[in-house]
């Protein structure tokens, strides 16, 4: 009975350990997806394309699994919070950028929920992206 209990306990511990490593791997790959979308956005430098790249980065990261979706949310929220602070420092309490930030967050959520990021793709954006 002790052997059976020990085997069950060990399998539970190893199972949780395995899930944790899987989550971390997904988060790491999801963070790379977010970085790739950001790099592509900077490279494209295409007018009105930021929502597309927000949605695409979140979509790609979330496709990795729960760890990727978590990383996408953390990175997206951090980016928007930093942008809010810099907007406040530049423009004071004018509300500048609030609507854009809300639209960015909507695009982020769109992508994370598995919806097609091409919904936000602007006409004329090169096929490379």
From Swiss-Prot:
<dbReference type="Pfam" id="PF00277">
    <property type="entry name" value="SAA"/>
</dbReference>
<dbReference type="GO" id="GO:0005576">
    <property type="term" value="C:extracellular region"/>
</dbReference>
<feature type="modified residue" description="Pyrrolidone carboxylic acid">
    <location>
        <position position="19"/>
    </location>
</feature>
<feature type="region of interest" description="Disordered">
    <location>
        <begin position="90"/>
        <end position="129"/>
    </location>
</feature>
<comment type="function">
    <text>Major acute phase reactant.</text>
</comment>
<feature type="compositionally biased region" description="Basic and acidic residues">
    <location>
        <begin position="90"/>
        <end position="103"/>
    </location>
</feature>
<comment type="subunit">
    <text>Apolipoprotein of the HDL complex.</text>
</comment>
<keyword id="KW-0873">Pyrrolidone carboxylic acid</keyword>
<dbReference type="InterPro" id="IPR000096">
    <property type="entry name" value="Serum_amyloid_A"/>
</dbReference>
<keyword id="KW-0964">Secreted</keyword>
<keyword id="KW-0732">Signal</keyword>
<protein>
    <recommendedName>
        <fullName>Serum amyloid A-2 protein</fullName>
    </recommendedName>
</protein>
<dbReference type="InterPro" id="IPR052464">
    <property type="entry name" value="Synovial_Prolif_Regulator"/>
</dbReference>
<feature type="signal peptide">
    <location>
        <begin position="1"/>
        <end position="18"/>
    </location>
</feature>
<comment type="similarity">
    <text>Belongs to the SAA family.</text>
</comment>
């Amino acid at each position: 009975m002790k052997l059976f209990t020990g085997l069950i306990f060990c399998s539970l511990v190893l199972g949780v350990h395995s899930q944790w490593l899987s989550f971390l791997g997904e988060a790491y790959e999801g963070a790379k997806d977010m970085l790739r979308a950001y790099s592509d956005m900077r490279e494209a430098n295409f007018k009105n394309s930021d929502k597309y790249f927000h949605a695409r980065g979140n979509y790609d990261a979330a496709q990795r699994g729960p760890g990727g979706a978590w990383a996408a949310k953390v990175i997206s929220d951090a980016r928007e919070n930093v942008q809010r602070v810099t907007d406040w420092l530049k423009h004071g309490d004018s509300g500048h950028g609030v609507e854009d930030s809300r639209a960015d967050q909507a695009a982020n959520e769109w992508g994370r929920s598995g919806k097609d990021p091409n919904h936000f793709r602007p006409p004329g954006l090169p096929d490379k992206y």
